[in-house]
Amino acid sequence: TPIPRELILPLTKHGSTRSKPLVKPGDKVLKYQAIACSEATGIVDQHAPTSGVIRAIENFAIPSPLNKESMCILLESDGFDAEIDHNAIADYRSLSYLELANLIEEGAIFGLSGEGYINHLKLSSGKAVKLLIINAAESEPYITAGEALLREKAKLVVLGAKILQAACMAERCVIAIDSNKTDAIEALEQTQLNCPIELIKVAPKYPTGSEKQLIQTITSKEVPSGKYPADIGILMHNV
């Protein structure tokens, strides 16, 4: 898929919280470069999705329940998709759990589910984690995105699970997957050789992939009403 010539990047998140631009019109930016930040809790920094030139910071009409214009950054792509230099970590095990959480925060990683949970906030809840669940069970019928990801990127998913386990200091880590996702299961089993992460196959029955239902399926524990999984020593991340 070709990169669009122009990208309109809204600065408003969650309805009203606006990020502060870190760039100005005329600036050249690289892919993954931070272009806006917010001091509000629960709002991650924004990064350039490709390389190019900032052409404007002004109001644009965007899809919104309020049906009104919003302040946005207009990025004109240069077509090169050039990235910033990454300071790669040779071995994540050389870092403390706080350093790992900080790197996740700098990477502006957050969940793509409806809640959009910020990953580093989940990791820094201050509550002891006994079990980390990597949720590879599809939450709705006919969804296959997780299965495709695991077929193609099983090694990276397992590595990510190891990093998350180190970051939250979980005693145990499992990957939960629908039992009928045979290709994804095979890819994980080949990757998991000599790996302490457990693979748990669950019945492909809606809504097993939902957070609280999956926790109950795996642990026989129920998350109390008004509480979070962290309150019973469990942390869950989707693939």
Predicted regions and their residues:
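Histidine-anchored nucleotide/phosphate-binding helix
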Residues: 151-167
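Short, compositionally biased
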Residues: 43-59
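Hydrophobic alpha-helical positions that pack around
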Residues: 171-239
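Short, well-structured beta-strand-loop connectors
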Residues: 24-37, 55-56
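N-terminal, Lys/Arg-enriched amphipathic/low-complexity engagement segments
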Residues: 1-22, 74
